[in-house]
């Protein structure tokens, strides 16, 4: 009887659960109503909500017995709208994952009614408001992940009432107030992530009550006070990150009792000495004490840290010599001692650090020669000894550093000649020997450094000529040879350097004219003042950018820029011949005499020390020397990688992994441990003006997710090179497909081109209209439109653009962009707004329509199309691949119209990108989705992953498809701007 009763009760419970589950289908449909952008991602969420149906809907996992919703995973679908309060009706759901969408509004209080919930992940959205107190009702909750939103208010102290909470990640929000002390009494909490908020108050002595906590991160807040003396009791900590707060006092002695792998205290106001006991923390892999006010010597006992890979002590007030014992740190990869007050010699023992990637000794008071032993650091990528008192010569043995990309020995007292062996350092992208006493000629072999981006030999005693071999520096962006004794002409070969942005030759003895530079279209900074140049200063091409100050001190130069006429009457010419001849003979004799005297005195005056301090810039103006080389992961598909992993996988960014070059970066391909490929962009700029602002911008960009934008997965900033990690897209750039050689060039039919145009427009429209703050791309071009395996367009390189200010326009100090795509209004005024991007996009449309480059053999595609439009012959320019595959050439004509509208000369006459999307959307007619083969969002499993696997597997994704617009709005757009296909739109 008892067994029968029990069975009946069990069956009754199951029937009740099944009956309750019948409501889950209707609940899901109610949740869908609050979402936007659902048409192409939740297309199967339809019908009457019967159990057997909704359990097969995308992202829905049901219990095998009751058919109740057990898990809901809609991550990475770019869903907009809000979270419906109806979500509280999912009584049996154990996991809700809505991360990496565009959800806004507040977290509904009804979330507290999901009483079975174990994992709640709403990260990487735009959710605002307070964290609801109702979450404290979720007694089974193990993982609460709300990072990267816009949440405000205080952290609810009621979160301490969650007895099973193991992961609490509230990073990258706008939370304020203090960290609730009651949280520290949660016995099972293992992960506490609070970085990048506005938290105040002090570190509680009770923080070590968390006996299971291994990850404690409060980086980038406004915490004050001292590190509590009880810190030594936090024996379970593996990662302790207190960086970028306002903490003061000395580093407590008992911090040495910790067995952490990462100890990061940088960017605070700690003072006093470095505790010697830190040398006993054998588990340390990363020790970062940089950018504080620490004083005294570097403890020699730090040499005992044989497992430490990164040692950052820069930006303090450390004195004394560099301990030779640091050479015993056998696994060290990064040694940053710059911006201190260190004295003495560079220890030869540092040569034992054969695994070292980065050695930064800049801005100290080090003396003596550079030891030859440094060349034993075979894996060294960056060596910076700028701003010391080093003497002797540049070691010839440095050429053994085959992996080095960055060499800066500037602002010292180095003498002798430039070793020709430096030309063997084939991976160099930066070579800076400026502000020394280096003498003799420039070795012509330097011209063989094909990856060189920046060359600075200024403020030395160099003689001879500028080598014509510099014309082989195809990647070079900056050349500074100013303040030397160079003579001869500016080589014609230098005028062929298409990537050259800066050329400084002032204060030399250079002769001839400047006409050879007229074809350096990218040249933005030119200074040839105080030489012996003569002739006419051009006024066209790039020379329109330069002020008269660029040409001062050259009496023989003339022209419009200098306010002096290059032509005089024949009478004046004849009357001055005799006087000129006499004067010329006298001057020539004097010059010959001076040359003889100079040759006799050369060995003596070549060694006269210069005042190095005159060319030593303010260290605060060069934050790059203060950049700790850290790897920051923004999305978890790269989680638990370290910088060394990436260096190892790419063999220290070997050239064999290069897949492309850009105006601002070299691009490498790296296959991660999980076999997922990523693209690594190594930026040419080493010195962001504001490191913290730059990092904040990168983190913001990393949170931007859209189907048609290339996602920033992470970044690393260091003097060795700033690296950005992006999604890798299989089919390269649109430029490759349209213009590359036979190996990459593909035939694109009309439908594919339309979809590429629409995808790029959707990505750009999202930046202009849906980001907060809005973003101007600044360099829209076919090389920045990448194509995935299905040839869907993804807009790249939007990440480094400055966010729009609250004003309507943004004034840039220099013209950005690529020749052929630059808005003429922007080029003339440097005033930048969204319409500058619209112009560039219009040029991309012309590329798609014609298959031709924007500029080719001095032929400008835009001008050519305008002339054809004026003659009503524009259709002659259509790419043959379009003519063969397009069923309605009227569509082609409409896109020509749109391209010319986008590239109108007056910005106010151009459409917005939202309007462009509407027009293209009406031309693209995708088949209605029937039953596309889409993978389920969650594995069909009856169990929910453990909290560790759940958190490790966090990853971004996006599959947004924009809403369609009515044809009426498209017709209104064409009516608004008028027919332009037969008009000259200039």
Swiss-Prot record:
<dbReference type="InterPro" id="IPR001611">
    <property type="entry name" value="Leu-rich_rpt"/>
</dbReference>
<dbReference type="Pfam" id="PF13855">
    <property type="entry name" value="LRR_8"/>
</dbReference>
<feature type="repeat" description="LRR 16">
    <location>
        <begin position="427"/>
        <end position="449"/>
    </location>
</feature>
<feature type="topological domain" description="Cytoplasmic">
    <location>
        <begin position="603"/>
        <end position="986"/>
    </location>
</feature>
<feature type="glycosylation site" description="N-linked (GlcNAc...) asparagine">
    <location>
        <position position="233"/>
    </location>
</feature>
<dbReference type="InterPro" id="IPR003591">
    <property type="entry name" value="Leu-rich_rpt_typical-subtyp"/>
</dbReference>
<keyword id="KW-0472">Membrane</keyword>
<dbReference type="Pfam" id="PF00560">
    <property type="entry name" value="LRR_1"/>
</dbReference>
<feature type="binding site">
    <location>
        <position position="681"/>
    </location>
    <ligand>
        <name>ATP</name>
    </ligand>
</feature>
<feature type="repeat" description="LRR 2">
    <location>
        <begin position="90"/>
        <end position="114"/>
    </location>
</feature>
<feature type="binding site">
    <location>
        <begin position="659"/>
        <end position="667"/>
    </location>
    <ligand>
        <name>ATP</name>
    </ligand>
</feature>
<feature type="signal peptide">
    <location>
        <begin position="1"/>
        <end position="21"/>
    </location>
</feature>
<feature type="glycosylation site" description="N-linked (GlcNAc...) asparagine">
    <location>
        <position position="304"/>
    </location>
</feature>
<dbReference type="InterPro" id="IPR000719">
    <property type="entry name" value="Prot_kinase_dom"/>
</dbReference>
<dbReference type="InterPro" id="IPR011009">
    <property type="entry name" value="Kinase-like_dom_sf"/>
</dbReference>
<feature type="topological domain" description="Extracellular">
    <location>
        <begin position="22"/>
        <end position="581"/>
    </location>
</feature>
<feature type="repeat" description="LRR 9">
    <location>
        <begin position="261"/>
        <end position="280"/>
    </location>
</feature>
<dbReference type="GO" id="GO:0033612">
    <property type="term" value="F:receptor serine/threonine kinase binding"/>
</dbReference>
<feature type="glycosylation site" description="N-linked (GlcNAc...) asparagine">
    <location>
        <position position="373"/>
    </location>
</feature>
<feature type="glycosylation site" description="N-linked (GlcNAc...) asparagine">
    <location>
        <position position="269"/>
    </location>
</feature>
<feature type="repeat" description="LRR 13">
    <location>
        <begin position="354"/>
        <end position="377"/>
    </location>
</feature>
<feature type="glycosylation site" description="N-linked (GlcNAc...) asparagine">
    <location>
        <position position="220"/>
    </location>
</feature>
<dbReference type="InterPro" id="IPR017441">
    <property type="entry name" value="Protein_kinase_ATP_BS"/>
</dbReference>
<dbReference type="GO" id="GO:0010286">
    <property type="term" value="P:heat acclimation"/>
</dbReference>
<dbReference type="InterPro" id="IPR013210">
    <property type="entry name" value="LRR_N_plant-typ"/>
</dbReference>
<keyword id="KW-0808">Transferase</keyword>
<feature type="glycosylation site" description="N-linked (GlcNAc...) asparagine">
    <location>
        <position position="542"/>
    </location>
</feature>
<feature type="repeat" description="LRR 4">
    <location>
        <begin position="139"/>
        <end position="161"/>
    </location>
</feature>
<dbReference type="Pfam" id="PF08263">
    <property type="entry name" value="LRRNT_2"/>
</dbReference>
<comment type="function">
    <text>Receptor kinase that may be involved in the regulation of cell proliferation and cell growth.</text>
</comment>
<protein>
    <recommendedName>
        <fullName>LRR receptor-like serine/threonine-protein kinase ER2</fullName>
        <ecNumber>2.7.11.1</ecNumber>
    </recommendedName>
</protein>
<keyword id="KW-0677">Repeat</keyword>
<dbReference type="GO" id="GO:0001558">
    <property type="term" value="P:regulation of cell growth"/>
</dbReference>
<feature type="repeat" description="LRR 20">
    <location>
        <begin position="521"/>
        <end position="545"/>
    </location>
</feature>
<feature type="repeat" description="LRR 17">
    <location>
        <begin position="450"/>
        <end position="472"/>
    </location>
</feature>
<keyword id="KW-0547">Nucleotide-binding</keyword>
<feature type="glycosylation site" description="N-linked (GlcNAc...) asparagine">
    <location>
        <position position="509"/>
    </location>
</feature>
<keyword id="KW-0418">Kinase</keyword>
<dbReference type="InterPro" id="IPR008271">
    <property type="entry name" value="Ser/Thr_kinase_AS"/>
</dbReference>
<feature type="glycosylation site" description="N-linked (GlcNAc...) asparagine">
    <location>
        <position position="328"/>
    </location>
</feature>
<keyword id="KW-0067">ATP-binding</keyword>
<feature type="repeat" description="LRR 7">
    <location>
        <begin position="211"/>
        <end position="233"/>
    </location>
</feature>
């Amino acid at each position: 009887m008892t067994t029968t009763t029990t069975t009946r009760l069990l069956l009754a419970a199951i029937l009740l659960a099944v009956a309750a589950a019948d409501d889950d289908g209707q609940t899901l449909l109610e949740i869908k109503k609050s979402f936007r952008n659902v048409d192409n991602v939740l297309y199967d969420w339809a019908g009457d909500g019967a159990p057997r149906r909704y359990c097969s809907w995308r992202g829905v996992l049901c219990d095998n017995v009751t058919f109740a919703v057990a898990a809901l995973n809609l991550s990475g679908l770019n869903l907009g709208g809000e979270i419906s309060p109806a979500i509280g009706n999912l009584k049996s759901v154990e996991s809700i994952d809505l991360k990496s969408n565009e959800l806004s509004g507040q977290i509904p209080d009804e979330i507290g009614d999901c009483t079975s919930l174990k994992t709640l992940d709403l990260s990487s959205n735009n959710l605002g408001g307070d964290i609801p107190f109702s979450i404290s009702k979720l007694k089974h909750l193990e993982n609460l992940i709300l990072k990267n939103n816009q949440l405000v208010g205080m952290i609810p102290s009621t979160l301490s009432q969650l007895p099973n909470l193991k992961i609490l990640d509230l990073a990258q929000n706008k939370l304020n107030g203090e960290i609730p002390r009651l949280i520290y009494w949660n016995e099972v909490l293992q992960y506490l992530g609070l970085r990048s908020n506005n938290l105040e108050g002090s570190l509680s002595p009770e923080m070590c009550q968390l006996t299971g906590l291994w990850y404690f991160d409060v980086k980038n807040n406004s915490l004050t006070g001292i590190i509590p003396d009880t810190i030594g009791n936090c024996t379970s900590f593996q990662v302790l990150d207190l960086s970028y707060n306002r903490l003061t006092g000395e580093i407590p002695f008992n911090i040495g009792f910790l067995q952490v792998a990462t100890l990061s205290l940088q960017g605070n106001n700690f003072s006093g000495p470095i505790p010697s006991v830190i040398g006993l923390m054998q588990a340390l892999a990363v020790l970062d004490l940089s950018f504080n006010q620490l004083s005294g010597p570097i403890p020699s006992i730090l040499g005992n840290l044989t497992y430490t890979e990164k040692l950052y002590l820069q930006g303090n007030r450390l004195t004394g010599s560099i301990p030779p014992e640091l050479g015993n740190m056998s696994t060290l990869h990064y040694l940053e001692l710059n911006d201190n007050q260190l004295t003495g010699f560079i220890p030869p023992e540092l040569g034992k650090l054969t695994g070292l990637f980065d050695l930064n000794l800049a801005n100290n008071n080090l003396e003596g020669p550079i030891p030859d032993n440094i060349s034993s650091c075979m894996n060294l990528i960056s060596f910076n000894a700028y701003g010391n008192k080093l003497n002797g010569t540049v070691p010839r043995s440095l050429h053994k550093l085959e992996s080095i990309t960055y060499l800066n020995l500037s602002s010292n007292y180095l003498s002798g000649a430039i070793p020709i062996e430096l030309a063997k350092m084939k991976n160099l992208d930066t070579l800076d020997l400026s502000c020394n006493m280096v003498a003799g000629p420039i070795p012509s072999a330097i011209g063989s450094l094909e990856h060189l981006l920046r060359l600075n030999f200024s403020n030395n005693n160099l003689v001879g000529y500028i080598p014509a071999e510099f014309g082989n520096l195809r990647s070079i962006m900056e050349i500074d040879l100013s303040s030397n004794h160079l003579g001869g002409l500016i080589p014609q070969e230098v005028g062929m350097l298409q990537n050259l942005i800066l050329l400084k030759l002032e204060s030399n003895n250079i002769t001839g004219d400047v006409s050879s530079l007229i074809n350096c279209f990218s040249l933005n900074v030119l200074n040839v003042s105080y030489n012996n140049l003569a002739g006419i200063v051009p006024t066209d091409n790039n020379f329109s950018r330069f002020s008269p100050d660029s040409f001062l001190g050259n009496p023989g130069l003339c022209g419009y820029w200098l306010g002096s006429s290059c032509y005089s009457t024949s009478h004046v010419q004849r009357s001055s011949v005799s006087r000129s001849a006499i004067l010329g003979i006298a001057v020539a004799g004097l010059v010959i005499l001076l040359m003889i005297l100079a040759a006799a005195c050369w060995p003596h005056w070549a060694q006269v020390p210069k005042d190095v301090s005159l060319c030593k810039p303010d260290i605060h103006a060069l934050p790059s020397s203060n950049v700790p080389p850290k790897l920051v992961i923004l999305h978890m598909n790269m989680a638990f990688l370290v910088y060394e992993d990436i260096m190892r996988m790419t063999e220290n960014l070997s050239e064999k992994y290069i897949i492309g070059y850009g105006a601002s970066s070299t691009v490498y391909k790296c296959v991660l441990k999980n076999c997922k490929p990523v693209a690594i962009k190594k930026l040419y700029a080493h010195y962001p003006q504001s490191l913290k602002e730059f990092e904040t911008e990168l983190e913001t960009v990393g949170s931007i997710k859209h189907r048609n934008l290339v996602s920033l997965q992470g970044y690393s900033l260091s003097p060795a090179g700033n690296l950005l990690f992006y999604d890798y897209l299989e089919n390269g750039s649109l430029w490759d497909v349209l213009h590359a050689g036979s190996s990459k060039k593909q035939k694109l039919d009309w439908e594919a081109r339309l979809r590429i145009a629409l995808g790029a427009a959707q990505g750009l429209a999202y930046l202009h209209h849906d980001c907060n703050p809005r973003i101007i791309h600044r360099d829209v071009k076919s090389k920045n439109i990448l194509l995935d395996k299905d040839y869907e367009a993804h807009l790249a390189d939007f990440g480094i653009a400055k966010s729009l200010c609250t004003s309507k326009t943004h004034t840039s100090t220099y013209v950005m962009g690529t020749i052929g795509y630059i808005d003429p209004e922007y080029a003339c005024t440097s005033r930048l707004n969204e319409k500058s991007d619209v112009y560039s996009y219009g040029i991309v449309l012309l590329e798609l329509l014609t298959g031709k480059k924007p500029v080719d053999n001095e032929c400008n595609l835009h001008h050519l199309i305008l002339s054809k439009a004026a003659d009503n012959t524009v259709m002659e320019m259509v790419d043959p691949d379009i003519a063969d595959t397009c069923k309605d050439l009227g569509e082609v004509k409409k896109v020509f119209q749109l391209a010319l509208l986008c590239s109108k000369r007056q910005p106010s006459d151009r459409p917005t990108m939202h309007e462009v999307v509407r027009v293209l959307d009406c031309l693209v007619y995708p088949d209605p989705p029937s039953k596309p083969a889409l993978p389920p969002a969650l594995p069909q499993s009856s169990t929910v992953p453990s909290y560790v696997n759940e958190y490790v597997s966090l990853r971004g994704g996006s599959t947004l498809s924009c809403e369609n617009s009515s044809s009426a709005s498209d017709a209104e757009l064409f009516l608004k701007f008028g027919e332009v296909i037969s008009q000259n739109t200039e």
